[in-house]
Every structure is written in C-alpha cells, then in structure tokens.
Design a protein with these regions (language model features):
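Terminal, non-globular segments
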Residues: 1-161
Length: 161
C-alpha cells in the first residue's frame, strides 16, 4: 500500500469536516468523504474498505438528524465494491479514473436514496438523475484535480504493490 494514498485520504477527510462542519457550507461543497474512500479502497482489502466506509458514513450521519445509518450503509457498500474493482478493472487512464470516481459517487447517492426510506427521499428522477448526477460530476472534477496534484490512483495497483 502506498502511504501517499492514505495521507491524501486523511487530508480529504479533515478538509471535508472543516468545510461541512466548521464553515457550514453543506451541499455546495464536494463529497470529500466519498472521494477519500474511493482513493483508499483501491489499495486495501474489501473488509477494510467497507469498515472505513462505515466509519466515514457514521461521521456523516452524526451531522444530521434523519436516517441515521443510511450514509454508513451507502459508504460501506461503495467501499466494498471499490475494493473489488481492483480485481475486475486494471488501469489508471484518465477515462478510467473519471469513470471510477463518477460511478462511485453516483452509487453512493443511489444506495443512500434507497436506504433513507420513502418518507424522507425526493422523487427518483430528481434525486438520481439531477442531484446525484451533478454531485457525481462535481466530485469527479475535484477528484481529477486531486489526482493531477498528488498522483493518487495512478501507478501500480494492488495489495502487494
């Protein structure tokens, strides 16, 4: 495992908390928890990625009052699938990284939408096409900037590298 990936993920988590909790920016800020999870999940085992996703999700859930555990479930599933993606997809091209980040964020929003319950969720077209699509695009652009600056998600992949 590369230390750089873990350092960048830790900084993304810290930045997420500062922006969302410290400054109270809310939905106008990118989802850096998901970005941090996607960066680290390609480097670790499925159980560790799911556990990290669950932990980050509980931190996210602690900031809100409704549907406690829905963020934890969503990030745990995304972390587990992202860790498995290392065995299914090999590559570090710009197209792959952009697709990986976009689909990871969109899947997180989809699982959250399903887990939150019908009483609290918006209509599917609004939530999954408009809101989740724009949020995934926003996080992908921020993620690509992080990739270019730090070099994470590039180079040799795998648990043994």
């Amino acid at each position: 495992m590369r230390i750089l990936d873990w350092v960048v993920a830790g900084l993304l988590v810290l930045l997420h908390l500062v922006i969302h909790v410290g400054f109270g920016v809310g939905a106008a800020a990118p989802d850096l928890f998901t970005l941090a999870l996607l960066v680290v999940a390609r480097e670790c085992h499925m159980a560790l990625a799911a556990g990290l996703g669950w932990t980050l999700g509980l931190l996210e859930d602690a900031q809100g009052l409704l549907a406690f555990g829905a963020h934890g479930l969503a990030l745990a599933i995304v972390g587990a699938l992202a860790a498995r993606s290392r065995e299914l997809f090999v590559g570090d091209s710009l197209l792959f990284v952009a697709s990986y980040l976009f689909l990871g964020k969109w899947l997180r929003d989809f699982v959250y939408w399903v887990a939150v319950g019908s009483g609290f969720r918006p209509p599917p077209v609004e939530a999954l096409v408009v809101d989740a699509g724009l949020a995934a695009l926003y996080m992908t652009l921020v993620g690509l900037a992080v990739v270019f600056v730090t070099g994470v998600l590039q180079g040799p992949r795998g648990v043994g590298s």
